[in-house]
Amino acid sequence: MEEQLIPIQWKDDALVLLDQTLLPNEVVYESFNTAEGVWDAIQVMKVRGAPAIGVSAAYGVYLGVKEFVESTEAEFIDEVKRVCAYLATSRPTAVNLFWALERMESVATDHTHLSITQLKDRLLEEAKEIHREDEEINRQIGEHALTLFHDGMGVLTHCNAGALATTKYGTATAPMYLAKEKGWDLKIYSDETRPRLQGSTLTALELQRAGIDVTVITDNMAAMVMSQGKIDAVIVGCDRVAANGDVANKIGTLGVSILAKYYNIPFYVAAPTPTIDLKTPTGKEIPIEERDASEVINRFGQYSAPKESKVYNPAFDVTPHENVIAIITEKGIVKAPFTENLKNLFQ
């Protein structure tokens, strides 16, 4: 087993991120000392995955105000709000980003009696707490998910909802790591996940380094491996779950869910509760980020289509709740009716 890749670290009063745009060929860690640097790291996907984005943004708030020139507490709180609003523009789909920023803003607005120095300390502690919570949430998701798995089964996953998308264990990959700890032998199939190839460059990399049996397939091979009986379950992560159980996740997830339903294979979604957005009624209201055409036709510095080609590049799609057998959270496994049962998680 190779040394574990650590996507997010806090060292020497700076945010240290593993640059995931360079994987699997280079392992490079980069330090960030400003909110602007964190914004850029999120936007260009040096850090990615809904939980990891949320944690990074939380640290970004602190970095954005730590050098704030001493003034009034009211002006400092306004600056916290400004930095939160700025970081919220980095990527629109992952609800963890907004959840984390709301927590950071609340630290300032709920503690107006503190001095500016005390507020700065409290902001950093809140960011660290969000970081710590994520690791525990992931393990709990893995423990619940493992009750749906058994030794020797074949599991398909899409994109990267692994340790690289969170702080440890991942969400969709958490049961894979825990199964490894139990001595189970799962057979993991990882869709490469066009156009940014997170399944092959990230999921396959981290599972292979952990000694977990993983096979990379192209996205359009999923139907074939299902038809061959190699897949017993599908598990994916998510960037947002609507109140009715519709799920926004990496582009291509919808197609995988349709195939799983056709072949009568259970389709599971691993979702930390901060990813569940009860304020969004259905998947139709989830904003879908559209990214640059170059990701599709010039991925490796050479055009794979005419340069002038029209390109449609949504980063996410929405899987209807009808295709989802269960949503696995740190609080337990949620099944239909999702509208009622998701709401019950927060009561």
UniProtKB/Swiss-Prot annotation:
Record's keyword terms, sorted: Carbohydrate metabolism, Isomerase
Class of the enzyme per the UniProt entry, highest EC level: isomerase
Pfam families: IF-2B
Catalyzed reaction equations: 5-deoxy-alpha-D-ribose 1-phosphate = 5-deoxy-D-ribulose 1-phosphate
Binding residues annotated for substrate, in chain numbering: R48, G49, A50, R91, Q198, N249, K250
GO biological-process terms attached to the record: L-methionine salvage from methylthioadenosine; pentose catabolic process
InterPro entries per record: Deoxyribose1P_isomerase_DrdI, IF-2B-related, IF-M1Pi, IF_2B-like_C, Initiation_fac_2B_a/b/d, M1Pi_N, NagB/RpiA_transferase-like
E.C. no: 5.3.1.-
Molecular function per GO: S-methyl-5-thioribose-1-phosphate isomerase activity
The UniProt record lists the keyword NAD: no
Site, as annotated: Transition state stabilizer: C159
Function: Catalyzes the isomerization of 5-deoxy-alpha-D-ribose 1-phosphate to 5-deoxy-D-ribulose 1-phosphate, as part of a 5-deoxyribose salvage pathway that recycles this toxic radical SAM enzyme by-product to mainstream metabolites.
Family per record: Belongs to the EIF-2B alpha/beta/delta subunits family. DrdI subfamily.
HAMAP family: Deoxyribose1P_isomerase (MF_02229), Salvage_MtnA (MF_01678)
Stated name of the protein: 5-deoxyribose 1-phosphate isomerase
Origin species: Bacillus thuringiensis subsp. konkukian (strain 97-27)
Protein's gene: drdI
